[in-house]
Amino acid sequence: GIDGLVERLIGMFAFAIWDVRKKRLTIVRDRVGIKPVYFTRAGGRFIFGSEIKAILSDKSVPRAVNGTAIAHYLSFMVAPAPLTMFRGIFKLPAGHIMEIEADGRARARRYWDALPGRSGIQNELVGLSDAAARDYLSKEVLKRLETAIDRRMMSDVPFGVFLSGGIDSSANVALMSRIADQRIKTFTVGFSDHTHLNELDYAEKVAKHFN
C-alpha cells in the first residue's frame, strides 16, 4: 500500500497517484516538506499543484487574502501549514498523506513524525552509561550524516556547498571532502559593514584545510 511505499522512499518528493479501481486520489509530501503541495476546492472540483500560481490560473479559484495567515507571518515570519496567504488555498503539511475520494471526501494524515514516542535509537540506549551513550550517539550521528551527504552528492551536474563558517556547513564540507574524488567548490558571503555577522575568516580556514 501507500504507507509501505513512502516508508521506503528517501529524499525529497511530492507526488499524486490516481487509483482507477478505488476512484481515489492520493497525494503525498516528503517527510520535512522540501517539495510543496497546494490544494483547493472550486467549481465542484479538487485542484492541486506544486505552485499556488498553477492553482490561481484556474478562473474558478477566487483570489482573496487570508488574514489569519498574514497575521501569523507578521508575528512569526511564516504561515504555518495548512494555511497559505490565499484564502481557501491550503498546503499539505510535511510528512502527510491526503486521500480524496470520488465523492469529494478528503482526509489528511501524518505518516512520519520527527519525534516518535520511542525510536530504535532510544531502545539502544537502555542500560548504557552516560559515557557509552554519548559514544554510541556520536557514532550514530556521524554515520547518518555520512549516508545523507553521500546520497546528496549523486548528481549529473556540478555541485558545491554554501560554507558559512559555522559548525553545520563546516561539517558538510569535511564529510564531502572525505567522500568525493574531487575538490569541493565552496561559496561564502562576507559582510563589510556588519562585522559581528561576518564569518568569512572561519569559512576561509575551513576551505583551505579541506581544499
Feature annotation, model-predicted:
Residues 1-211:
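Cysteine-centered catalytic environments shared across enzyme families
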